[in-house]
Amino acid sequence: MNNNINFIKCSSYEELSKKTANDFITVIKNKPNSVLGLATGSSPMGVYKELIKAYENKEISFRDCVSFNLDEYIGLKKEYEDQTYKYFMNDNLFSKIDINKDNTFFPIDAFSTNMNQDFESYDSKIDSYNGLDILILGIGNNGHIGFNEPGSLIDSKTRMIDLTESTIKANSRFFKSENDVPRKSVTMGLSTILKAKKIVLVVVGDSKKEALNALMNSKSFDSNWPCTALVNHDNVVVYYIG
């Protein structure tokens, strides 16, 4: 390990999910009006199930919490509402806890066709809540975090990006035709991510091993592996299965 990231090996996905959820629970107990940074995808689903359990057991309340999601598609057809990240969050977390839906924010309305918006205003909105107290991230095979693909700049802010061909192809299974797959998304930038007070990265799946190794062995940011931006932060935990 060549950096000050805290790498924690877990024996199972269940253990990884519980440990990550406990980090969130600790933050929320200490600060009931915590500002949470949330991600979509299969990796954090177990974490959200654990947070729902903690809420049901009256261990924590999300009533005063605020959330900001990492990313969202843009230019999606209305018929695919169930493919939006907003739908995912409502389905897998928000509808099962007591968070105020008015306090759950996304970088864009997925159905928006206006590609010339001030996307950086999302950063200002986060700043207006004094920043994210804790942020969960997943990681892509190529080391992307959010939709910050290889080549992303360390000082990047929330912005619209073109999805890679491999991402479009991977997503096509959720759509009737590849033509319906969104070509663009809006993502928090690397500098937006690094402003979070605590970052928890969950690494699930053998296909992520190369990216995990790149992060473990990095002393400084390498734009070929966007995840290495995390070496510039002093409060990062990485949970991985080994």
Swiss-Prot record:
Any one GO MF annotation of this record: glucosamine-6-phosphate deaminase activity
Biological or metabolic pathway of the protein: Amino-sugar metabolism; N-acetylneuraminate degradation; D-fructose 6-phosphate from N-acetylneuraminate: step 5/5
GO biological process: carbohydrate metabolic process; glucosamine catabolic process; N-acetylglucosamine catabolic process; N-acetylneuraminate catabolic process
PANTHER family attached to this UniProt entry: GLUCOSAMINE-6-PHOSPHATE ISOMERASE
Source species, domain of life: Bacteria
NCBIfam families in the cross-refs: nagB
Encoding gene per record: nagB
Role: Catalyzes the reversible isomerization-deamination of glucosamine 6-phosphate (GlcN6P) to form fructose 6-phosphate (Fru6P) and ammonium ion.
Xref: InterPro entries: Glc/Gal-6P_isomerase (IPR006148), Glucosamine6P_isomerase (IPR004547), Glucosamine6P_isomerase_CS (IPR018321), NagB/RpiA_transferase-like (IPR037171)
SUPFAM superfamilies assigned to the protein according to its UniProt record, in alphabetical order: NagB/RpiA/CoA transferase-like
Entry EC no(s): 3.5.99.6
Catalytic activity: alpha-D-glucosamine 6-phosphate + H2O = beta-D-fructose 6-phosphate + NH4(+)
EC class name: hydrolase
Entries under CDD domains matching the protein: GlcN6P_deaminase
Protein name according to UniProt: Glucosamine-6-phosphate deaminase
Positions annotated as active site in the UniProt record: 71, 142, 144, 149
A GO term from the CC aspect: cytoplasm
Family: Belongs to the glucosamine/galactosamine-6-phosphate isomerase family. NagB subfamily.
The entry's keywords: Carbohydrate metabolism, Hydrolase
